[in-house]
Amino acid sequence: GIGLAKQIKNDKPMKFKLMGFISDDVEIKHHHLMGAKVYALDKNTIKVMRDNKITTLLVSPGAINNFRADKEFQDAILAEGIRIYMPTTQEWNTEQQQLKEVSIEDLLPRDEISIDMESVGSMLHGKRILITGSAGSIGSEMVRQIAKYSPAELILIDSAETPQHDIRLMMAKQFPDIKAETIVTTICSKSRMEHIFKTYLPDYVFHAAAYKHVPMMENNPCESIQNNVYGTKILADLAVKYGVKKFVMISTDKAVNPTNVMGCSKRICEIYVQSLNKAIEEGIINGKTQFVTTRFGNVLGSNGSVIPLFKKQIKAGGPVTVTDPRIIRYFMLIPEACKLVLEAGTKGNGGEIFVFDMGKPV
């Protein structure tokens, strides 16, 4: 906390005025540091902040984990309209820390996920990787993470032209040495998909393309079946035909005992790729492709998540609407979801459904 306080005092122009410290260290309670009083973290903390007209709370690197775990204190701070800033994780060990305002994602009470980087790297390095839905929130993060492992080539497929163009620009800027083909097409075009598989002969397929908005698919069930089911069947069949080593399909927890069209469509996809895997293992179908499925729930920041809707409702002054007050939601960050997809792709031997631990309910 001292280092952070020195930094804000030395900032030119000064962005923050140091009014005090909050600490759970009883030995320094009521002392003064750098001319500012040290307050205890207790039931009176919020009143002290209100009396001193505090508008901003800076969280030091050493206090971030405890702060994330203290849901009651977070709620009280936010209820007072106090803005929260903390250093970005990349800068915790540097002398000059860049502060950013805290988002909902930063408050998720969870340690960073670590994966077997060596195994993932050996699987992806020097290989041809095909990613569907590459311009989506999950797909685009998959592109960024996979590109770090120096694949021989990325074949990126999405039907959204402008976001796909953004991916092309991102690849050219951040990964200029990685060969990338950005293709605009629908996975439902069998002839186009066949041409792509025949031309590029991918080693691995990460299938992230899907319609995922539950209410939209309830009103458009034919599109859900066409895109999610038929599109997946086309890709899976071609993966077998053209010798793909591993096909990793991204599914959803809504496929478990599905109660809506979208969940049903994804469950059908799971069953189909598992049946293909079994047929290959039993010698009914000639092929070598291993099919692995990954399931997870709400992803913070995803285009299909409720979080963007909640943010808009909060900014508009409310109310925040939920489908049912009894609903319990679990959330995961996009980067950690994608890391787990890569981990599952590495560890899966075919036929498995990997269900991600979504942590504590929010």
PLM feature spans:
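A solvent-exposed beta-alpha-beta segment
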Residues: G1-Y85, S159-D166, K173, A180-E181, ...
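Flexible, Lys/Arg-rich cytosolic regulatory linkers and terminal tails that connect or flank
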Residues: K29, D42, N66-R128, V240
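Conserved Rossmann-fold cofactor-binding substructure of NAD(P)-dependent oxidoreductases
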Residues: V184-D203
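Conserved S-adenosyl-L-methionine
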Residues: P13-K15, A147-E153
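Conserved Rossmann-fold NAD(P)-dependent oxidoreductase catalytic core, especially the SDR/UDP-sugar
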Residues: E80, T94, L201, H207, ...
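Proline-aspartate-enriched helix->loop->beta-strand connector
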Residues: M49, K53-T55, P151-A152, F197-F206, ...
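N-terminal Rossmann NAD(P)H-binding glycine-rich loop of SDR-like oxidoreductase domains
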Residues: T132-A135, S140-Q145
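NAD(P)-dependent short-chain dehydrogenase/reductase
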Residues: D237-V240, V261-F354, G359-P361
